[in-house]
């Protein structure tokens, strides 16, 4: 319906940066990179690119569904927030 939660387009939320081997993953936080086939990398070299998110002006979102307390579904049923999985 007009004026409902879905009335305004989500122009301010973009996909988070790609990361990990071959750029197959997505950043879930400044130190977290999750890739469908590989799982999640936390605080490793694969997640280093995710620190760039701190310097970008617009917010981003990874994962399809919300889970836990402010998290998003990552891989293999794992729920990740910017602080951890």
From Swiss-Prot:
Domain of life per record: Eukaryota
SUPFAM superfamilies, alphabetized: Neurophysin II
Gene3D superfamilies the UniProt entry points to: Neurohypophysial hormone domain
Disulfide bonds: 16-60, 19-33, 27-50, 34-40, 67-79, 80-85
Family the UniProt entry places it in: Belongs to the vasopressin/oxytocin family.
Assembly and oligomerization: Interacts with oxytocin receptor (Ki=1.5 nM). Interacts with vasopressin V1aR/AVPR1A (Ki=37 nM), V1bR/AVPR1B (Ki=222 nM), and V2R/AVPR2 receptors (Ki=823 nM).
Function: Neurophysin 1 specifically binds oxytocin. Oxytocin causes contraction of the smooth muscle of the uterus and of the mammary gland. Acts by binding to oxytocin receptor (OXTR).
Protein name (record): Oxytocin-neurophysin 1
Organism name: Papio hamadryas (Hamadryas baboon)
Taxonomic path: Eukaryota, Metazoa, Chordata, Craniata, Vertebrata
Name of the gene this protein is made from: OXT
